[in-house]
Curated annotation (Swiss-Prot):
Signal keyword on record: no
Keyword DNA damage attached: no
Cofactor: Zn(2+)
Pfam families assigned: TGT
GO terms classed as biological process: queuosine biosynthetic process; tRNA wobble guanine modification; tRNA-guanine transglycosylation
Organism: Buchnera aphidicola subsp. Acyrthosiphon pisum (strain APS)
Keywords: Glycosyltransferase, Metal-binding, Queuosine biosynthesis, Transferase, tRNA processing, Zinc
Protein name: Queuine tRNA-ribosyltransferase
Length: 370
């Protein structure tokens, strides 16, 4: 993977990834396909929303369907029929958030897996092997995630352990001699001084990109933005910056404003399944009875499949009947909205009009009552 920044408007950056001749423009939003599927839609439909790179979760795929099944197909790309790049999360977050029993030592984590309750040992070495077997284009280091608002000492200990695992991840990743990329993850909770130490040590190890972990886990938005203001300027300018698990449309705007290049989040797909649909002026809650006889499309500025062929009335009906088609059409629309937003952001950076674009974005938002 090669990465190059081509345009800059203040701190906002527009660049390109080159994955073996496949070009991905940044800033980029990655739909989440945890189990090798973006819920309710096919890979062809994912591509038609404008999505070119997706995220899957190595932790979940390790347990279901298991590496043996995926390797029968060659790799995860073949298994799910996706020709574009895939970033895999190592599973650190899931280990610490899903497990009923979790014991951490220097080598890794012993936990009860959420499938059958069996004790499982996961280490940087195992995580790198899993992601290598999946054929991930971007591999994330194995890290220790902690809850928001932990005290300084607990946060420092977790950050230092993540650094130790980062070094191990680098060694084991390099041993596979593949041409894929490895990203480090900056930790340190809400403490800027710990974030500084984490980043500087990760830079010494030398990763292909740097992710900001442990954000959007309960902290006030202003706190997240302040941390981005603090840490993004310190990340090497020639390396991509990835804000993990974020965000809402306004988070994408504010992340890009601070120099972030990559995002992922379940919000567009999860909200779609719950009938919350993103449009130019805000959010439509399609299950509200006011849409029962509304013959208009979701958003007359949108050219997605859903907006071209279906009315709000029909989408309201599908939601009321719990029809699977409703989730599918809603997901297509929300992902198309996100990818259109990212495309517009990129164009504004290229034209040095990002600030005006963001002003217009907030002006349009919530102009009418949904």
């Amino acid at each position: 993977m090669n990465f190059k920044v081509l345009y800059q408007d203040n701190n906002a950056r527009c660049g390109v990834f080159n994955f073996n001749q496949e070009i991905i423009e940044t800033p980029v939003f990655m739909p989440v396909g945890t189990y090798g599927a973006v819920k309710s839609i096919s890979t062809e439909e994912i591509k038609n929303t404008g999505s070119r790179i997706i995220l899957s979760n190595a932790f979940h795929l390790y347990f279901r369907p298991g590496l043996e099944i995926i390797k029968l197909h060659g790799n995860l790309h073949n298994f799910m029929n996706w020709s574009g790049p895939i970033l895999t999360d190592s599973g650190g977050f899931q280990v610490f958030s899903l497990s009923r029993f979790c014991k951490v030592n220097e080598e890794g984590v012993i936990f009860q897996n959420h499938i059958d309750g069996k004790k499982t040992f996961l280490t940087p070495k195992i995580s790198m092997k899993i992601q290598s077997d999946l054929g991930s284009n971007i591999v994330m280091i194995f890290d220790q995630c902690i809850e928001y608002n932990q005290n300084w000492e607990k946060t420092k200990n977790a950050m230092e352990r993540s650094l130790y695992w980062a070094k191990k991840s680098r060694i084991y990743f390099d041993s596979y001699k593949n041409k894929n990329s490895l990203f480090g993850i900056i930790h340190g909770g809400i403490y800027p001084s710990l974030r500084d130490i984490s980043l500087q040590e990760l830079i010494k190890i030398d990763f292909d990109g740097y992710a900001l972990g442990g954000l959007a886990v309960g902290e006030p938005k202003i706190e997240m933005y302040k941390l981005l203001d603090h840490i993004c300027p310190q990340i090497p300018k020639n390396k991509p910056r990835y804000l993990m698990g974020v965000g809402k449309p306004e988070d994408l705007i504010e992340g890009v404003r601070r120099g972030v290049d990559m995002f992922d989040c379940v919000i567009p797909t999860r909200n779609a399944r719950n009938g919350h649909l993103f449009v130019t002026n805000g959010v439509i809650k399609i299950r509200n009875k006011k849409y029962k006889k509304d013959l208009s499309c979701l958003d007359n500025t949108c050219v997605c499949y859903t907006c071209r062929y279906y009315s709000r009335s029909y989408l309201h009906h599908l939601d009321a009947c719990n029809e699977i088609l409703g989730a599918r059409l809603n997901t297509i629309h929300n992902l198309h909205y996100y990818q259109t937003l990212m495309s517009n952001i990129r164009n504004s950076i290229k034209n040095n009009t990002f600030e005006q674009f963001s002003v217009n974005f907030y002006k349009q938002k919530n102009k009418i009552d949904f």
